[in-house]
Amino acid sequence: MALFTDSGTEAKAPHIRASGSRGSDLDVERDRADELAREFYSTPRASSQILSDGGGPFGFDIHAAFIFDEVQSRLDADAIIETGTCLGDTTDYLSRVYPDLPILSVEIDGNRAEFARLRLRDRSNVEVVRGDSATVLEATAHRFSRPIFYLDAHWADDWPLRRELDTVRQGVAVVDDFDVGHDRFGFDSYGGVDCNAGRIKESLPGCAIWIPDVGFRHRYPCLQVGRRAGRAYVAIGQRAKDTLSSIPMLMSHD
């Protein structure tokens, strides 16, 4: 299967939106949150023995799933590109929630890539690729006009984040393990360099960065009692900036 061909793919994920009264809007928002929660908590945590957060979609942080859904809907994304598949927990979740969106996931470890490929072999919208994430992004990212990048390949000795960001030209990049300035959320540091706004803007000087508003009241609590990862939501281009600025779950980090 080759979803990411040179001809590209134009797809839209179904996302319920209501018109009419605010009451109707609230009902739809509630139903969507319930739908996401069912998919989120039914996803097997295959990475539970590997990752410090116990695995699961988005490190078992359902608030990250809610924010991602808002980004996807408001951006009208035409692809999801994930780096750092591991065993496919997040990929599994995304493939079920957005069955009409092409999803590319990149993993450098051969055994993990093969596990994820077998796990997701029945998902026609998913392609798992073994390889260097920045190299794969360079070859594929330009084929889409409104992609969401989920960059989570920055845990090994080789930190590919800078090279990944150098390939991003449009859309929204979600950077995992980012320093959001809150004690509850962890972040990565390699060779004395923290995963922070300065690191991102070295590669994307014209970008704008948002982070989660920790005071936002979500419909469901986050059940991750261990390590929670901070995340940056990076807008490249005016459409992406307009998208992120419209999401009440986020706050500007600039």
PLM feature spans:
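A short alpha-helical cap/connector motif
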Residues: 1-148, 153-254
